[in-house]
From Swiss-Prot:
GO terms for cellular component: cytoplasm. GO terms for molecular function: acetylglutamate kinase activity; ATP binding. Pfam families: AA_kinase (PF00696). It comes from the Bacteria. Keywords: Amino-acid biosynthesis, Arginine biosynthesis, ATP-binding, Cytoplasm, Kinase, Nucleotide-binding, Transferase. The record marks 8, 215 as: Transition state stabilizer. This is Acetylglutamate kinase. Its main location: cytoplasm. Belongs to the acetylglutamate kinase family. ArgB subfamily.
Length: 250
């Protein structure tokens, strides 16, 4: 969809919702840009799981999700994080609506082949009609990263992956993956640009590790599937690291 910008809010979503953030959103809307947000919630999910004495485990930067963890994830994302985000927009008189996989089967998903991860899925289809209808009315959509499979079972989905799938399905002009660091670092230095062909090498050499591994894999997917600009940063006001779809030289 022309003039669409997708933003993935970080695990501590409230950290991203600064006055500068809303100022940029307002400027984009004034320029007829359409805004879609996909939010994480890992920090709050972990806190709730610890409070309920549910073990917190990860593998390759992804949360291992059993039935108890999935119920907590749904509760926190839909009942806590998403309403906090939409309320922040409403306080500034910005039209917004929260959506999840239960809304007309918005995000269809299949379970990942790595069964060690449990009830974790990958988006297979984004039903864009509802999103596009809301965007045409200048309503910002805020989407929780949960999917539903063909048997109507809910699945936890990595928020970066969900944001990239949504951006690709909408043919967004830009995707911002907001995180807790100002870009991809090599030591203490921010890398300005990374070609998708360089990502595997950066992972093997240890430059990319932990949660940045699935984040960059998702960013590469978006860059190679129709999203013009893919940027990893901690703020809409920070340049961050641009992920480009091109072959590395040398």
């Amino acid at each position: 969809m022309e003039n669409t910008i997708v933003i993935k809010l970080g695990g501590v979503a409230s950290d991203n919702l600064t006055e500068g953030f809303f100022r940029q959103i307002t400027e984009w809307q004034a320029a007829n840009k359409k805004i879609v947000l996909v939010h994480g919630g890992g920090h709050y999910i972990t806190k709730m799981m610890e409070a309920l004495a549910i073990p917190v485990e990860t593998k390759n930067g992804l949360r291992i999700t059993n039935k108890a963890a999935l119920e907590v994830t749904k509760m926190v994302l839909i009942g806590q994080v998403q309403p906090a985000i939409t309320t922040a927009f409403q306080k500034r008189n910005i039209s917004v609506i929260g959506l999840n996989a239960g809304d007309t089967g918005l995000l269809e998903a299949d379970r990942l082949s790595d069964t060690d991860l449990g009830l974790v899925g990958k988006i297979t289809k984004v039903k864009t009609n509802l999103i596009e209808q809301l965007l045409s009315e200048n309503i910002i959509t805020v989407i929780a990263p949960l999917g539903i499979n063909s048997e109507h079972d809910w699945l936890n989905v990595n928020a970066d992956t969900a944001a990239c799938e949504v951006a690709s399905a909408l043919h967004a002009e830009a995707l911002y993956l907001l995180t807790d660091v100002p870009g991809v670092k090599n030591g203490s230095e921010i890398i300005n640009e990374i070609a998708t062909a360089e990502i595997e090498k950066l992972q093997k050499t240890g430059v990319i590790k932990g949660g940045m591994i699935p984040k960059l894999a998702s960013a590469a997917f978006a860059a190679e599937n129709g999203v013009d600009q893919v940027i990893i940063t901690n703020s809409l006001e920070t340049i961050g690291t641009k992920i480009k779809s091109k072959v590395a030289i040398g």
